[in-house]
C-alpha cells in the first residue's frame, strides 16, 4: 500500500509539473475565475484519492489516481499562484469554443483510467464483495 501511495504521489507531482511548465510558457487569453470553493474541492479530492486509492490492490488504479491528482494539483497551484485565475491556453473553436489546459486533460484521463481499473478490479474480485469487512 505504501509503494502504491508513493507511486501515486510521484506521478501526481510529475504531471502537475508538466502542466505548470506548459502554463508558464503558453499564452492564454482565457482564465478560470479564482474561487476559494474550487480550491477547497480540489484539495479535498487530492487528499481523498491519495488516502483511499492505495487501499485497492490495483496498480492501474494508483496510476490513474496519480494522473488525476496531477491534474487537480496543477489547477490548484495555478489557482493559488496566478492572480488572473487558472490559465487555459488550449482552445477548440474560435468564438464559442472550449478553453482548457493540460491539467484538465490529465484530470479527465486519470479519472477514466481510475474508474476503468476499479471496475476491472471489482469484476475480478466479485466473489469477495459479499464478505464482511
Show where each model-derived region lies:
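Alpha-helical transmembrane bundles and membrane-interface segments of multipass inner-membrane proteins
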Residues: 1-133
Amino acid at each position: 500500500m505504501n509503494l502504491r501511495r508513493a507511486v501515486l504521489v510521484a506521478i501526481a507531482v510529475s504531471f502537475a509539473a508538466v502542466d505548470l511548465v506548459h502554463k508558464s510558457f503558453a499564452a492564454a487569453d482565457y482564465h478560470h475565475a479564482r474561487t476559494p470553493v474550487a480550491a477547497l474541492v480540489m484539495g479535498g479530492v487530492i487528499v481523498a484519492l491519495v488516502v483511499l486509492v492505495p487501499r485497492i490492490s490495483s496498480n492501474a488504479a494508483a496510476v490513474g489516481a496519480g494522473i488525476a491528482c496531477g491534474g487537480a494539483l496543477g489547477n490548484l497551484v495555478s489557482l493559488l499562484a496566478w492572480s488572473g485565475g487558472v490559465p487555459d491556453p488550449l482552445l477548440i473553436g474560435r468564438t464559442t469554443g472550449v478553453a482548457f489546459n493540460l491539467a484538465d486533460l490529465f484530470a479527465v484521463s486519470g479519472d477514466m483510467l481510475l474508474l476503468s481499473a476499479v471496475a476491472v478490479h471489482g469484476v475480478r474480485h466479485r466473489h469477495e464483495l459479499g464478505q464482511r469487512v
